From Swiss-Prot:
Binding site for beta-alanine: 61
Record's function text: Catalyzes the condensation of pantoate with beta-alanine in an ATP-dependent reaction via a pantoyl-adenylate intermediate.
Catalytic activity: (R)-pantoate + beta-alanine + ATP = (R)-pantothenate + AMP + diphosphate + H(+)
Enzyme class: ligase
Localisation: Cytoplasm
Binding annotation for ATP: 30-37, 147-150, 176, 184-187
Gene Ontology biological-process annotations: pantothenate biosynthetic process
Record GO terms (molecular function): ATP binding; pantoate-beta-alanine ligase activity
Similarity annotation: Belongs to the pantothenate synthetase family.
PANTHER family: CYTIDYLATE KINASE/PANTOATE-BETA-ALANINE LIGASE (PTHR21299), PANTOATE--BETA-ALANINE LIGASE (PTHR21299:SF1)
Pfam families the UniProt entry points to: Pantoate_ligase
Native source organism of the sequence: Rhizobium meliloti (strain 1021)
UniProt-recorded name of the protein: Pantothenate synthetase
Biochemical pathway: Cofactor biosynthesis; (R)-pantothenate biosynthesis; (R)-pantothenate from (R)-pantoate and beta-alanine: step 1/1
Length: 291
């Protein structure tokens, strides 16, 4: 694996592969990799001739009081993991490489990006869309891989690609989980031992929603209310978003019928924010009662 830090060097390195007609897969990350990231790498390697992973802690997507300064970083560790994973190129630019002067151009998907997580993190998704667009312009991948754990982000990127006719296929990869069901996340390392134990309630809350829907609850507000009550059983959990939405548009759902619905959770434990979600198909819910 070759590590590259400048845009010009990466473009030059990829040009010969592009001329040879080789397909390129991109796995954008902020580093401090875990098994979820490595599943993205594995998928990219199975579907492309050349795999590029990027590591860049993007300041545009962090708010003034967020964790930019303490976001975990360990480039040597990440390089070893990516080498073992078969990545061909690691693009690891500095802030001055990506943003040599203050950005005047911002890519925003305002409707999708201002709700749910965007409502409690204003400007976050504009920062994401901007850096992802820049990475797409630099790498020019055939395919780009994102985890379904960040479902709102995934749908925003898909809409951005569609609206701007960007020549890349966006592929969502199912969430990888730890033994107790907690979604793998670089931010899990922030949790204290007590908070980590408490965080197991997040995937259990998704199970609870699926049970409710399988039992015949059709009012989204009722499901949301009861999931909030369920989360209230864990004193360390502070839910910020509990929302049932349409999985394609992220718009509100008036009633739970035959169409799948998406439950999005955004829960704080101490200073750590955890995201999770599940798409639930009412007729095939795992907890459906046997007739």
């Amino acid at each position: 694996m070759r590590t590259i830090s400048t845009i010009a060097d990466l473009r030059e390195a990829l040009a010969e592969h592009r001329r040879a007609g080789r397909s390129i897969g991109l796995v954008p990350t902020m580093g401090y990799l875990h098994v979820g990231h490595m599943e993205l790498v594995r998928r990219a390697g199975s579907e492309n001739d050349v795999v590029v992973a990027s590591i860049f802690v993007n300041p545009l997507q962090f708010g003034a009081n967020e964790d930019l300064g303490k976001y975990p970083r360990d480039l040597a560790r990440d390089q070893a993991l990516l080498t073992d994973g078969g990545v061909d190129f690691l693009f690891a630019p500095g802030v001055s490489d990506m943003y040599p002067r203050p950005m005047e151009t911002v890519v925003d998907v305002p409707k999708l990006g201002s709700e749910l997580e965007g409502a409690v993190r204003p400007g976050h998704f504009a920062g994401v869309a901007t850096v992802v667009t820049k990475l797409f312009n630099i790498v020019q991948p055939d395919r780009a891989y994102f985890g379904e754990k960040d479902f709102q982000q995934l749908q925003i990127i898909r809409r951005m690609v569609e609206d701007l006719a960007q020549p890349v296929t966006v592929i969502g990869v199912p969430t990888v989980r730890e033994e107790d069901g907690l979604a793998c996340s670089s931010r899990n390392v922030y949790l204290t031992t007590q908070e980590r134990r408490a965080a197991a309630i997040v995937p259990k809350a998704l199970d609870e929603a699926e049970r409710l829907i399988a039992s015949g609850v059709t009012e989204p507000a009722e499901v949301e209310k009861r999931v909030l009550e369920f989360l209230a059983g864990e004193p360390l959990a502070r839910p910020e978003v509990v929302a049932l939405r349409d999985p394609e548009t992220l718009g509100p759902v008036s009633e739970i019928e035959e169409k799948p619905v998406l439950l999005l959770l955004f829960v704080r434990f101490g200073t750590t924010k955890l995201l999770d979600n599940r798409v639930i198909a009412p007729k095939s819910a795992r907890f459906a009662k046997v007739a």
